[in-house]
Amino acid sequence: MKYLGTSKMSLKEINEEFYKLACYFNVFPGSDRTYVMLEGLKENMPKAMALFEEILADAQVNKEAYGNLAGDILKKRTDAKLNQGQNFNKLIQYAIWGPKSPATNVLTTAELQQMDPQELVDRIHKINSFDHKILYYGPEKPQAVLDIIKQYHNVPEQLQPVPAAIEFSQQETPENRVLLAQYDAKQIYYSAVSNRGEKFDPAIQPTLNMYNEYFGGGMNAIVFQEMRESRGLAYSAGAFLITPSKLKYPYVYRTFIATQNDKMIDAMKAFDEIINNMPESEKAFNLAKDALITRLRTERITKSDVLWSYLNAQDLGLNTDSRKELFEKAQTMTLPEIKAFQEKWVKGRTYIYCVLGDEKDLDLKGLSQYGPIQKLTQEELFGY
């Protein structure tokens, strides 16, 4: 969309006009939410919105721009396969979702190259015809904002429902198994992923946050102290019970280690030991409590982030700021409460063990003790 002109204005003229108005727009396509954003000076909002709406309604195909865009995407894909972090992220996504996931739901090279850009432009023209929300952050009075929207935001009398998205399911982990992906490096990236299918429960959130702070958080947390400082088995390490982003998704427990290839099995054994038999330290707990309370005291959600925090809360069925309850309960929380939480929510889990490393340098016999090994190609991980 940012590459297109209209029947009346070239792309250069559009960019010049937005520059004069000290405004700009952006487009954010997502797997379950797409939004367009207009930002700039209050006094120029009507003109900027009129221009923006003109682009939505009258964007014209630019085949040369599409060819360049497709080429850029293919170049980024090639670069991504060379990056250790990108490979590891795709491996984690495979463990969470399985072979069919939002991460692999991408156009093939042939589809990218052969696509008619008119299809994309037609979708731009239709975006205002679907159900949507309008969010506003700024100094203008509410009624003035409504008046501007009514005047410049072009919508049909009857909006259409948003087309159903492709549904992907996060896979549970009923038994231990290993996913191994080849990457030529002297250091492995390792993660254990566990999903028992437990859905969002606001009642556990304060204790969950304190557990994460105490056990898997920063440099004073148990994981970092045990795995790096005490045992020297990892360059970096962490472990967290991750809160779902939507009600339909489950909690996922996930660990992370970066270590030398020859230390892989020792690191995995040590990690399993502290996860299932969590060390208890009042000193470390008090540091974690102080860190969490201090962060809550100083953290501010401001400007347009207030709107997004509100939408994120709605996605979990909440109508209040969950940090308030967390702050109140954190004051009196105790280490035995964290231990009880760990016994119920963490201990004894089964995992998908993910290893990204150079296979020729790894102890595959030792790795097989953690479950059957499935070797994955980059095509399986990236979807192309």
Segment roles from a protein language model:
Residues 1-7:
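Active-site SXXK
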Residues 8-9, 60, 64, 201-205, ...:
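Ordered, soluble secondary-structure elements with a strong preference for glycine-centered loop motifs
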Residues 13-162, 236-384:
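Charge-rich, well-structured scaffold segments of protease-associated domains
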Residues 161-222, 256, 383-384:
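His/Glu-based metal-binding/catalytic segments typifying zinc-dependent metallopeptidases
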Residues 175-176, 187-189, 205, 220, ...:
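Active-site lining segments that contact anionic ligands and/or coordinate catalytic metals
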